[in-house]
Structures are given as C-alpha cells and as structure tokens.
Amino acid sequence: MKKFLIFLIKVYRKYISPLKVPCCRFYPTCSQYVLEALQKHGIIKGGFMSIKRILRCNPFCKGGYDPVK
C-alpha cells in the first residue's frame, strides 16, 4: 500500500503538478513532504502527518520551512 501511494504521488508530481501554478507555501513542497513522511514513518503516521500538512497549506497559513521530523 505504501509503495502504491508513493507511486501516485510521483505520477502527480510528473504529470499534474507541472500543469498548475506553483502555490505551495511550504518548503519542502507538500508532495515532497508526503513522500518523505510515508518513507520515514509509514502509511499510518506518515499519512496522518501528510493530511495535517495539506490542510495547513492554505492562504490563511504563513507557511515556511516545515521538514518531516
């Protein structure tokens, strides 16, 4: 399951992301954060961290440097 999710993120980054205007308020980008979180913490904790991060990526959040810990 983890490999499948990582595959989906890579497909998104290669084919869908280039079509959009860059708008992520964080570094690393949300898609990179998701990849790192899944690889480092697994599907449960990494998935939860990813959802929290994506919900924070909005116009009302300042953004900035937010690495996977």
Swiss-Prot record:
It is found in: Cell membrane. The keyword RNA-binding does not apply. It is a peripheral membrane protein. The keyword Flavoprotein does not apply. Disulfide bonds: none annotated. It holds the Pfam family YidD. It comes from the Bacteria. Its main location: membrane. Keywords: Cell membrane, Membrane. One of its GO terms (cellular component) is plasma membrane. Could be involved in insertion of integral membrane proteins into the membrane. Belongs to the UPF0161 family. PANTHER family: MEMBRANE PROTEIN INSERTION EFFICIENCY FACTOR-RELATED. This is Putative membrane protein insertion efficiency factor.
